[in-house]
Amino acid sequence: MAREQLNGASYNWNAFPDRPQLAVALAGRVADRLTRAIAERGTAVLAVSGGTTPTKFFAALSAMPIAWDKVIVTLVDERFVPASSPRSNAGLVAANLLQNAAKAARFVPLYHEASGIEDAAASDDAALRSLPWPLDVVVLGMGPDGHTASFFPDADDLAELLDPASDRIILPVHAASAGEPRLTLTLARIIDAGFIALHIEGEDKRTAFDGAVAPGPRKPIRAVLDAAPRPVEVFWAP
């Protein structure tokens, strides 16, 4: 059921009794959207998030019988660390999503060696313009502070990251709370996606989400809900 919030923000709340059931349901929805995109334009582009939350979802999605050789997988955001780092989202995706049938997908990472994160972001921005836009599916996560992608509340240039009219695809992120510098898709590119899911688990994340959509200071996840032209699909399990 869509739950309309202030300032036009809307979302569909999809609750599940446990995390394995959520993973299977979300994988099915994503697979359906990717299959539809392949039928319509011959390819599909999926952007996923890192962290520990999506591992069961990745495993379920990796076994879905879709034309993975026609799927491009990229990241919503990435730490400025090599894939060999245990904190790398690329490494997480390689180990958990790009397995089974999904081994046939093409993966486009965000991290590469560069003189600095600003140069890496500029290079990524240019390279990603060759992908077929808009994205077909984006799967977001959310931190307890209400951040999503690398839109940290204390990020330098947060207004630029959250500009729905931005023509940038990737921007660098510097935020004290983030640890390493980050690379992230901009809000403008996320909200263009045909299907946007927010995957959260646990009572703490539900509390954080409810706080983000309540009246008061706007958290970054609320910026996505406000700007997206269609309801965001929220998937939650305790």
From Swiss-Prot:
The gene is pgl. It comes from the Bacteria. Belongs to the glucosamine/galactosamine-6-phosphate isomerase family. 6-phosphogluconolactonase subfamily. Pathway: Carbohydrate degradation; pentose phosphate pathway; D-ribulose 5-phosphate from D-glucose 6-phosphate (oxidative stage): step 2/3. InterPro entries: 6-phosphogluconolactonase_DevB (IPR005900), Glc/Gal-6P_isomerase (IPR006148), NagB/RpiA_transferase-like (IPR037171), PGLS (IPR039104). Hydrolysis of 6-phosphogluconolactone to 6-phosphogluconate. It comes from Mesorhizobium japonicum (strain LMG 29417 / CECT 9101 / MAFF 303099). Keywords: Hydrolase. GO terms for biological process: carbohydrate metabolic process; pentose-phosphate shunt. Gene3D superfamilies: 3.40.50.1360. The keyword Hydrolase applies. Its EC number is 3.1.1.31. It catalyses: 6-phospho-D-glucono-1,5-lactone + H2O = 6-phospho-D-gluconate + H(+). One of its GO terms (molecular function) is 6-phosphogluconolactonase activity. This is 6-phosphogluconolactonase. It holds the Pfam family Glucosamine_iso.
